């Protein structure tokens, strides 16, 4: 079902509608039928789509068409998407004029992933080197990722979960390109941060921010929970644990998936809440109760990986529950692809198939 839907529905939708044949790169703002409603290019999604088509070429079938689509995005990122220091802009116009400065380090993370996979697909050492260079630049920036674009003061310093989380996945993507000791060092750092700092020992759930010493902060950001993020990180942990044959980490990650799901599942309408406040206060995010496609897809990946390693019946039951909700509410059999944004009751809130944050990758 999933393979068929991916290869015969989702990927063809993006092949048909997203390619900018004039400027290169991809249009991601697509309405329900696939028509382009905005031509700006967001570098998170350019990198992710280039990675996706490179990975399809490497792991599913070496179709020349997939490699060409990947190259279109790769060339756009390399020639238009980076500043003189190699930092990746956040967004550009259709023809490649920078719109938003390179304040968001995740643009760089997805570009590095894309360069690495494309380098393998095209057997191009130059892109492997560019992936490595971009990765090392990310490490250099990790303690102050926004640099001069940081708008916060130092009055309430908080550490963010997002970077160690993405590094735990990025380093495995770049494993063949990086020095082995660099890979192990980054994995050690990421696992320590995710499982010992941001995973709260008392509640068993993941917080988005902590104080620099790892303690919890009683503020909007300090109480913030993003269930989809926490669950996604657990499948990164499972991948690392399998690589290291670490049963303890597999079991802890599996247990954490269940804890987060128990906390964040909407018992009234079904689905997983987008944001929550750890103390049950009103969340700062007005969209807190929406149901998002990526949250449910990442949860299905995490549950599938956890079940593969544990055969735990509780995981199987959760998988069925999330699977049934997702296919019932997000899939669009009429026009293809999936809806991204539902209200709390599970009704389509925006009928777009792509936008600033939703793309071909998820």
Language-model segments: what does each one mean?
Residues 1-362:
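Glycan-recognition and catalytic cores of secretory/periplasmic carbohydrate-active enzymes
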